[in-house]
């Protein structure tokens, strides 16, 4: 098949909040245009969500792409390249790179729920990328749907004219053909010059067991052919193209891709790390001089230690992480050791959902039992000798005497919540040291903007927000800057030994509450030993909270009948000596669940 005329190509992505039905709409578009037969679609929902976890949680994690053929009402044949994007804030970089490869977006909004915080964030990404946007109202067949009200809401909140929004129900297929026509008439074709030197954008890459690294590309100028020698401008590496093709979602091989087309190439690339997302691909013999504007690389924001419960699983864990890293360049890890937990890894994630998903994939796909330490963020330390350092593990914090100032990262959070939960949401943000920036109303819902320290958000903010708003509030954030903070390092001591896995940086005002809650939890879960065990929370040398696990005690005087009190006293003294000795040399076993519970404590 020859490459299509550029005016008949439409590249678009679907932008929506979680659960507003974008993967289902993608299924319908594939079905109507014949990308997969009805037999292949049967029993399969969310064709583009290939990971089990994606289907189960109903979220899209990796951006996927599919090419569809469509004969429009004007009798011409069009080629659509649909880029499915994730909706969740942690995967914003997946969204930004899908959008960079398109000219237009379908904005899908649930007609019963309206605009959510992450819809907003993704729409702004699309507007920044210079997209034409077609609003689509989904689930209009539901009894709770209020299309007119939602249209008005789209205009008020986003500022888009939604009067001619397409009304659909992706589940039943109602109105979906109108979406295809809107794509043809309302979205622009790509621009590009077929005769110019090859210039293509590297949109994504992943590892395939048979083909090696598969690279998803969007050709901007020139032609990408099989057998051509290409160069990655960012890394300077050159490769020979082995195969060229596109997805329908099945892989189809072709001879070449022309300007405006989206497809994949494979070359003998060994690791995904060799391909930088957002890089420019060009011809090795006559390279272009200017690179395409890429997108910001994904920077890890949240860090935590992952340790195998069984020390023998360490190598399995290392191999498993290497495999996940093949497909997820934003996940980083390095080895670390902990006195309490043994060998493990310090990992960097884009956010809490990312952390949860990696953890779940490790335990599910590789059958590993893991302990995660408390999540932390990157702090900047200014030292008294004038140097600066960044730390993301509280254990590495230098001596307090050497620190002149600690700075922590802040975020701007946008929260949309129904009016009746506004009070609880505001209280939650205040408790987390937030500063309110603005509060506006969109119909019956409030939109609040808050500045919050990221440290307070990574722990369990999202869960708390969902629980105080009965699941109705939605939340999106972006990093703003670093600000000085009064942070202290809190350690948990068990039998006077610090447990490094539980040490954390907390704000001075919250240290006592946090410390007390943690020691109380630990007291419940550490089983009694033959000697009493003090559990303390301390800042520096000062203990701020303490609980004691009582000792198990044998009745040594049981076999003395009557007789002299000094005999009993001698036995009791002897027992006391033994206990004292035990306490000096005894080792306390801290069970697994005590760690996990202590880390989940909410102060």
Curated annotation (Swiss-Prot):
Keywords: Cell inner membrane, Cell membrane, GTP-binding, Hydrolase, Membrane, Nucleotide-binding, Protein biosynthesis
PROSITE patterns: G_TR_1, G_TR_2
Catalytic activity field: GTP + H2O = GDP + phosphate + H(+)
Superkingdom: Bacteria
Annotated binding of GTP, by residue: 19-24, 138-141
EC numbers, comma separated: 3.6.5.n1
GO molecular function, one term: translation elongation factor activity
Protein topology in the membrane: Peripheral membrane protein
A GO biological-process term: positive regulation of translation
Primary subcellular site in the record, as a coarse category: membrane
InterPro entries to which the protein is assigned, alphabetical: EF-4 (IPR006297), EFG_III/V (IPR035647), EFG_V-like (IPR000640), EFTu-like_2 (IPR004161), G_TR_CS (IPR031157), LepA_C_sf (IPR038363), LepA_CTD (IPR013842), LepA_IV (IPR035654)
A Pfam family reported for this protein in Swiss-Prot or TrEMBL: EFG_C
Subcellular location: Cell inner membrane
GO cellular component: plasma membrane
Residue intervals of the tr-type G domain: 7-191
Family of this protein: Belongs to the TRAFAC class translation factor GTPase superfamily. Classic translation factor GTPase family. LepA subfamily.
Biological role stated in the UniProt entry: Required for accurate and efficient protein synthesis under certain stress conditions. May act as a fidelity factor of the translation reaction, by catalyzing a one-codon backward translocation of tRNAs on improperly translocated ribosomes. Back-translocation proceeds from a post-translocation (POST) complex to a pre-translocation (PRE) complex, thus giving elongation factor G a second chance to translocate the tRNAs correctly. Binds to ribosomes in a GTP-dependent manner.
NCBIfam families: lepA, small_GTP
Entries under HAMAP family matching the protein: LepA
Name of the protein in question: Elongation factor 4
Organism, scientific name: Rhodopseudomonas palustris (strain TIE-1)
Gene designation: lepA
């Amino acid at each position: 098949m020859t490459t299509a005329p550029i005016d008949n190509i439409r590249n678009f992505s679907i932008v929506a909040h979680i659960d507003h039905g974008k993967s289902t709409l993608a299924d319908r578009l594939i079905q109507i245009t014949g990308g997969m037969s009805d037999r292949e679609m049967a029993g399969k929902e969310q064709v583009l969500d290939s990971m089990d976890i994606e289907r189960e949680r109903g979220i899209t994690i990796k951006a996927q792409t599919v090419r569809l053929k469509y004969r429009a009402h004007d009798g011409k044949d069009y080629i659509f390249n649909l880029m499915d994007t994730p909706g969740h804030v942690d995967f914003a970089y997946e969204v930004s790179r899908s959008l960079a490869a398109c000219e237009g977006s379908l904005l899908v909004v649930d007609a019963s729920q309206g605009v959510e915080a992450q819809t907003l964030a993704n729409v702004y990404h699309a507007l920044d990328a210079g997209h034409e946007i077609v609003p689509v109202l989904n689930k209009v067949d539901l009894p709770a749907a209020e299309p007119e009200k939602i249209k008005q809401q789209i205009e008020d909140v986003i500022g888009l004219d939604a009067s001619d929004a397409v009304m659909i129900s992706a589940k039943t297929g109602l109105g979906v053909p109108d979406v295809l026509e809107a794509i043809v008439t309302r979205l622009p074709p790509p621009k590009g010059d077929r005769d110019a030197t090859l210039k293509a954008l590297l949109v994504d890459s992943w590892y395939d067991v048979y083909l090696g690294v598969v690279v998803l590309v969007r050709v901007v100028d020139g032609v990408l052919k099989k057998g051509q020698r290409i160069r990655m401008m960012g890394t300077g590496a050159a490769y020979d193209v082995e195969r060229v093709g596109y997805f329908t979602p099945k892989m189809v091989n072709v001879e070449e891709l022309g300007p405006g087309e989206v497809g994949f190439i494979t070359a003998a690339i060994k690791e995904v790390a060799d391909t930088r997302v957002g890089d420019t691909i060009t011809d090795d013999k006559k390279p272009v001089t200017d690179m395409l504007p890429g997108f910001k690389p994904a920077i890890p924001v949240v860090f935590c230690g992952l340790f195998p419960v069984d020390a023998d699983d360490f190598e399995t864990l290392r191999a498993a992480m290497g495999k996940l890293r093949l497909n997820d360049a934003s996940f980083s890890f390095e080895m670390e050791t902990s006195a309490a937990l043994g060998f493990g890894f310090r990992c960097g994630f884009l956010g809490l959902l990312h952390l949860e998903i990696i953890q779940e994939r490790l335990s599910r796909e590789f059958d590993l039992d893991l302990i995660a330490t408390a999540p932390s963020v990157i702090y900047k330390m200014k030292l008294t000798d004038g140097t600066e350092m960044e730390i993301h593990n509280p254990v590495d914090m230098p001596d307090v005497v050497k620190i002149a100032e600690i700075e922590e990262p802040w975020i701007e959070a946008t929260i949309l919540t129904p009016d009746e939960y506004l009070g609880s949401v505001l209280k939650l943000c205040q408790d987390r040291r937030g500063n309110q920036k603005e509060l506006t109303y969109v119909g019956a819902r409030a939109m609040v903007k808050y500045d919050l320290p990221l440290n307070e958000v990574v722990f369990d903010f999202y869960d708390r927000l969902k629980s105080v708003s009965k699941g109705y509030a939605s939340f999106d954030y972006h990093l703003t800057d670093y600000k000085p903070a009064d942070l202290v390092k809190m350690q948990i001591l068990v039998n006077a030994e610090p447990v490094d896995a539980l040490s954390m940086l907390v704000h001075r005002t919250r240290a006592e509450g946090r410390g007390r809650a943690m020691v109380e939890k630990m007291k419940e879960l550490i089983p009694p030993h033959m000697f009493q065990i003090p559990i303390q929370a301390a800042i520096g040398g000062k203990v701020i909270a303490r609980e004691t696990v009582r000792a198990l005690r044998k009745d040594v005087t049981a076999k003395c009948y009557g007789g002299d009190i000094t005999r009993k006293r001698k036995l009791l003294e002897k027992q006391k000596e033994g206990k004292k000795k035990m306490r000096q040399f005894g080792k306390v076993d801290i069970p697994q669940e005590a760690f996990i519970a202590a880390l989940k404590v909410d102060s």
